[in-house]
Amino acid sequence: MSYYQHPLDVTGLPSWKALEEHRLAMQHFSMREAFKADPTRFDDLSVSCSGLFLDYSKNLITPETRTLLVNLAREAGVEQAARAMFEGERINASENRPVLHTALRRPMGDSVMVDGKNIMRDVHTALAQMTDIVTRIHNNLWRGFSDKTITDVVNIGIGGSFLGPQLVSEALLPFTQHGVRTHYLANIDGSEFREVTAKLNVETTLFIISSKTFGTLETLKNAQAARNWYLGKGGTEEKLYRHFIAVTSNKQAAVDFGIREKNIFPMWDWVGGRYSLWSAIGLPIALAIGMSNFKDLLSGAYSMDQHFLSEPFESNMPVLLAMLGIWYHNFWGAQSYAFLPYDHYLRNFVKHLQQMDMESNGKSVRQDGTPVSCSTGPVIWGGVGANGQHAYHQLLHQGTPLIPADFIVPVVSHNPVADHHEWLYANCLSQSQALMLGKTREEAEAELRAKGLSEAEVQRLAPHKVIPGNRPSNTLVMETISPGRLGALIALYEHKVFVQGVIWGINSFDQWGVELGKELGKAVYNQMTRFDAAPAEDASTQGLIDFFRGRHRG
């Protein structure tokens, strides 16, 4: 029986019941003591693949916990669900669509059938189209209206058309080729438009409009503003095609805008926005780093795909991360999860993960429309490196909530400065160590006495210096950030999110809450700008509309 047609009530499975009992037995488990008792714990609770090394030994688990979590994944049908996704079954049940972002990174010669058609031909045709335009721009064959070469590319898109490409193009800045700079215009905010365009020369700027329907409000408004900016700075209608290209499934709308059909790249219904950076949505990435590096990005993701499909669950990196998340969210009550990358180039990784995870698994009904039987979708947050240590890490160490964390760090920096990276790496390891070890009352008192404080002062200050410890974390290490390893890293978390969605029985590939916001936004706009519009449905919204109108009247 297909999981997406008849999802299981996971809380009724024997493996779920076994985990509930195990959780009670783990109430007083100490990671400190576990490491003392088992010198092989690190080796037993770590795994590597696709250029990534995962240490998950600093978790509230034993080998028995891992066995029970893996049993739950098997009993919930994760293996069958993964096969269904990769083979093109319509696992996005609410929209009756296949989910095939994984096809975008499969090699030429593979076959994936959708409605009787091998979509791999379309995938590699689009890659060839991308290669052509990247080559022309990098070889100075594509020129603007004044015959100058392209130096800047502005991607106009929002959500998945923005977050993934921005993450990758910034993470791979050391791989930038031919001096092409990428910029991103997403928000419908005049200030953002002003800040982006202020850096640009209209004669050497190319805009990419990324919108599946060519009708996304924020994207269309920014595209129209960019067009007006281009015309106002000396560009002509006749040569507009040299400065605007599109990634869309609505060819006619793009042609009507002034874009030549050969400069329109495809989008497909079987690729969701938050999983689309591997497609022509990734064109700004390819323009920045070149097609060879872009294909390495795809290859890294493909390597993780194969690991996910073939590796036993006991050593399957996406499955292990997913089930650890289930363990903390559903059995320990953790409501949020922190991601802490220790590299400046990964500073936007958390923003991409927020969409990937919360837009995917922020659901309260299962695939068949029935209410979920357990909590889903934790809050995803975090930030880059040592900055967080001087901000929110305090909450991780001494706060009352249990907040699991993933640390992500490369061994080698692209930009070595003195011993900076050694200190950065040391900070990363010491934070995960401090979360695990903490500081006992005895250790706090001994530390204060060693400073010569009176016993009264020792007793007064010691409670404040106690750090509970026993806080779980994973540490993901890679040699250095490269296109292949970054591709594997992103695919790792894509599959983690998918596995959790299967466990909860939800559809990780629709986003009806987002759609409601779009609908109401149009209604509120009309109520703000048209005095003959019906009033808002609630007094709060109407009051805020009236405040806006009053301010704009003078």
Swiss-Prot record:
SUPFAM superfamilies the record matches: SIS domain
| Keyword Cytoplasm belongs to the record | yes
Q: What highest taxon heads this organism's lineage?
A: Bacteria
Active site: residue positions: E359, H390, K518
The catalysed reaction is: alpha-D-glucose 6-phosphate = beta-D-fructose 6-phosphate
Q: Where in the cell is it found?
A: Cytoplasm
Q: What class of enzyme is it?
A: isomerase
Q: Which CDD domains match?
A: SIS_PGI_1, SIS_PGI_2
**Has UniProt tagged this entry with the keyword Membrane?**
no
Name the Pfam families on file.
PGI
- InterPro entries membership: G6P_Isomerase, G6P_Isomerase_C, Phosphoglucose_isomerase_CS, SIS_dom_sf, SIS_PGI_1, SIS_PGI_2
UniProt keywords (A-Z) are: Cytoplasm, Gluconeogenesis, Glycolysis, Isomerase
Major localization class: cytoplasm
Which GO molecular function, any one, fits this protein according to its record? carbohydrate derivative binding
A GO BP entry is: glycolytic process
Pathway the protein contributes to = Carbohydrate biosynthesis; gluconeogenesis; Carbohydrate degradation; glycolysis; D-glyceraldehyde 3-phosphate and glycerone phosphate from D-glucose: step 2/4
Any one GO CC term of the record? cytosol
Physiological role: Catalyzes the reversible isomerization of glucose-6-phosphate to fructose-6-phosphate.
PANTHER family tied to this protein: GLUCOSE-6-PHOSPHATE ISOMERASE
The cross-references to HAMAP family, in alphabetical order and at most eight, read: G6P_isomerase
Q: What name has this protein been given in UniProt?
A: Glucose-6-phosphate isomerase
- Which species is this record about? Stutzerimonas stutzeri (strain A1501) (Pseudomonas stutzeri)
The lineage, from the top, is: Bacteria, Pseudomonadati, Pseudomonadota, Gammaproteobacteria, Pseudomonadales
